[in-house]
Curated annotation (Swiss-Prot):
InterPro entries from the UniProt entry: Helicase/UvrB_N, Helicase_ATP-bd, Helicase_C-like, P-loop_NTPase, UVR_dom, UVR_dom_sf, UvrB, UvrB_inter
Taxonomic lineage: Bacteria, Pseudomonadati, Pseudomonadota, Gammaproteobacteria, Enterobacterales
Identification of the protein by name: UvrABC system protein B
Key words of the record: ATP-binding, Cytoplasm, DNA damage, DNA excision, DNA repair, Excision nuclease, Helicase, Hydrolase, Nucleotide-binding, SOS response
Function, as annotated: The UvrABC repair system catalyzes the recognition and processing of DNA lesions. A damage recognition complex composed of 2 UvrA and 2 UvrB subunits scans DNA for abnormalities. Upon binding of the UvrA(2)B(2) complex to a putative damaged site, the DNA wraps around one UvrB monomer. DNA wrap is dependent on ATP binding by UvrB and probably causes local melting of the DNA helix, facilitating insertion of UvrB beta-hairpin between the DNA strands. Then UvrB probes one DNA strand for the presence of a lesion.
GO molecular function, one term: excinuclease ABC activity
Residue ranges constituting the UVR domain according to the UniProt record: 630-665
Known partners and oligomeric status: Forms a heterotetramer with UvrA during the search for lesions. Interacts with UvrC in an incision complex.
UniProt source species: Yersinia enterocolitica serotype O:8 / biotype 1B (strain NCTC 13174 / 8081)
Localization, UniProt: Cytoplasm
Length: 670
């Protein structure tokens, strides 16, 4: 019997949530393909969606526009569904340079990539959950529309082991090698196996916490046990176990041999075309490269850049969509598109950028034309494959509104009673000095400020100016990677600094209840960064604070400003009426400062340094004498460096914060 979703929350739906949940469920049960939930910042959109998932009990994919937001949603869904499978599926590249050719300088750039092993394990865990159970929520980025191994081949390659099964050791080892597991009797890690006599230990590729022990006796599986790979301690026996391939791209030998024949046929045709056009260098290049790949595939079962032959390996025809995560989602699955006004255009844009780069590679003989089918889904293919969909946004785009027939489900009232920020329009002439005085007021009462500018140059100059005048300020720009960006946002919330300056980086979905002021410089300059949607999203960053306020600096009120102010005031009035009717006093959000960085770091479970373990509060050291306090600082610093050497950056960061506080305490009492 399939397990049901069980929602854990100390809250019950309130405000506009019960009505939104009822309408969404009604629409899904009536077979509506598209619905739009217009939920303002802080209205509990994720909680509403979690209730819908739990009530309908259907496997669900949640699409987010970027890794940061996907990580935040993953953390929230894990809290709502601790007993169910909540999975995380984003690009596993920490760094990715696709192969490319620049004809103007005759430069070929080899593919170069760095894979995050922990995220690869989470991707494998996500597809395994979708294949094995129905109580699954997969939080994914737009990586979900990129090619993945064919689910049919993936299922065929699995190794099923059952207690009492007749199979010899050699057969198991051969099958493990076909699944791309490697034997390593010294270092036992994910995706490896080791052999000790009649005992085979397998560390599944999708696991980071446990491994499988297979005990054989006279060509029979005598016992299957789950054990802790770190301590070796047996946890429990299982009657059967399925070993999944180490990678999504694993392919049976017979399919590889068939693919090789098809590649040879295409190569012969391509050579004729190139020779007919007198492209001798390109003909020599494609022949040499393809024959080398064929030789590797014959010997090893794979080659570098094998994804460029994915059309043959998956058995799909020219122009057909590649297999993606959507192929793993059951037909009655549910799709939630979060921050849909950003996510939907992203899906549409991925295919075109990929296509132009590949066409150059094909034209100059670096790849066969079939490589063009190793691509993300086209938008129309996404539309055809997507199951019943709920678009979630505070500012839905034209596409979502059209698809849902203009019928939008409003979730404007917040259960906490929090009102939308007050909006003031102030002149541009004095914007910098006015902003500085506002920052000082907020810093004095331990609140944070977000400032958005129009250009990178202005952001840099403003940051420098604010620093010179004593403000604790940081600048967030496009060169900062995902992990560092998360650290900056975390440090802002912790009070390491008071002001964050950005351009277009602080809009959708990020929870920062400590931010009480959003300042939008040059708000009267019409354009993408100052459109109605951008303004509403930016203003919304202050909507989680009791004293939320937005200052728009402009010498005139543009049409976009007028619409954004009008919509914010409409929402504010609706919330105010709700509060008065029910006697609700607005309450600020007290959201704990979690750390989503662990998504990119391996688990430290079992090492006595679990991620859940909180660093001791500095209040515990208030009574220490200066000498004892100095000793404690040295101890914590030593621990911090040990964590950093072990790549346990989350614990190191927590200790760094604690050492910083203790140093201030030490200075105060010295």
């Amino acid at each position: 019997m399939s397990k049901s979703f069980k929602l854990h929350s100390e809250f019950k739906p309130a405000g506009d949530q019960p009505e939104a949940i009822r309408k969404l469920e009604e629409g899904l049960e009536n077979g509506l393909a598209h619905q739009t939930l217009l939920g303002v910042t802080g209205s509990g959109k994720t909680f509403t969606v979690a209730n819908v998932i739990a009530d309908l009990n259907r496997p669900t994919m949640v699409l987010a526009p970027n890794k940061t937001l996907a990580a935040q949603l993953y953390g929230e869904m894990k809290e709502f569904f601790p007993e169910n499978a909540v999975e995380y599926f984003v690009s596993y590249y920490d760094y990715y340079q696709p192969e490319a050719y620049v004809p103007s300088s005759d430069t070929f750039i080899e593919k170069d990539a760095s894979v995050n092993e922990h995220i690869e394990q989470m991707r494998l865990s996500a597809t395994k959950a979708l294949l094995e159970r129905r109580d699954v929520v997969v939080v994914a980025s737009v990586s979900a529309i990129y090619g993945l191994g064919d689910p049919d081949l993936y299922l065929k390659m699995m190794l099923h082991l059952t207690k009492g099964m007749i199979i010899d050791q050699r057969s198991i080892l051969r099958r493990l090698s076909e699944l791309q597991y490697s034997r390593n009797d010294q270092v036992f890690q994910r995706g490896t196996f080791r052999v000790r006599g009649e005992v085979i230990d397998i560390f599944p590729a999708e696991s980071d916490e446990w491994a499988l022990r297979v005990e054989l006796f006279d060509e029979e599986v005598e016992r299957l046990s789950i054990f802790d790979p770190l301590t070796g301690q047996l946890q429990h026996e299982v009657p059967r176990f399925t070993v999944y391939p180490k990678t999504h791209y694993v392919t049976p030998r017979e399919r590889i041999l068939q693919a090789m024949e098809d590649i040879k046929v295409e190569l012969a045709e391509r050579r004729k075309v190139l020779l007919a056009n007198n492209k001798l260098i390109e003909e020599q290049r494609i022949t040499q490269r393809t024959q080398f790949d064929l030789e590797m595939m014959n010997e090893l079962g794979y080659c570098s850049g094998i994804e460029n032959y994915s059309r043959y390996l998956s058995g799909r025809g020219p122009g057909e969509p590649p297999p993606t995560l959507f192929d793993y989602l059951p037909s009655d699955g549910l799709l939630i598109v979060d921050e849909s006004h950003v996510t939907i255009p992203q899906i549409g844009g991925m295919y075109k950028g990929d296509r132009s780069r590949k066409e150059t590679l094909v034209e100059y003989g670096f790849r066969l034309p079939s490589a063009l089918d190793n691509r993300p889904m086209r938008f129309e293919e996404f539309e055809a494959l997507a199951p019943q969909t709920i678009y979630v946004s505070a500012t839905p785009g034209k596409y979502e509104l059209e698809k849902s027939g203009g019928d939008v489900i409003d979730q404007v009232v917040r259960p906490t009673g929090l009102l939308d920020p007050l909006i003031e329009v102030r002149p541009v002439a004095t914007q910098v000095d006015d902003l500085l005085s506002e920052i000082r007021i907020r810093a004095a009462i331990n609140e944070r400020v977000l400032v958005t500018t129009l250009t990178k140059r202005m952001a840099e100059d403003l940051t420098e100016y604010l620093e010179e005048h004593g403000a604790r300020v940081r600048y967030l720009h496009s060169d900062i990677d995902t992990v560092e960006r998360v650290e900056i946002i975390r440090d802002l919330r912790l009070g390491e600094f008071d002001v964050l300056v950005g351009i277009n980086l602080l809009r959708e979905g990020l929870d920062m209840p400590e931010v009480s002021l959003v300042a939008i410089l040059d708000a009267d300059k019409e354009g993408f960064l100052r459109s109605e949607r951008s303004l509403i999203q930016t203003i919304g960053r202050a909507a989680r604070n009791l004293n939320g306020k937005a200052i728009l600096y402009g010498d005139r009120i543009t049409a976009s400003m007028e619409k954004a102010i009008g919509e914010t005031e409409r929402r504010r009035a609706k919330q105010q009426a709700y509060n008065e009717e029910r006697g609700i006093i607005p309450q600020g959000l007290n959201k704990k400062i979690g750390d989503i960085l662990q998504l990119g770091q391996p688990s430290t479970r079992g090492k006595g340094k679990g991620r859940g373990g909180k660093v001791a509060d500095t209040n515990n050291y208030q009574s220490l004498a200066p000498k004892a306090l100095d000793q404690k600082i040295r101890e914590l610093e030593a621990k911090m460096y040990t964590h950093a050497q072990n790549l346990e950056f989350e614990q190191a960061a927590e200790l760094r914060d604690q050492v910083h506080q203790l140093r201030q305490q030490f200075i105060a009492i010295s």
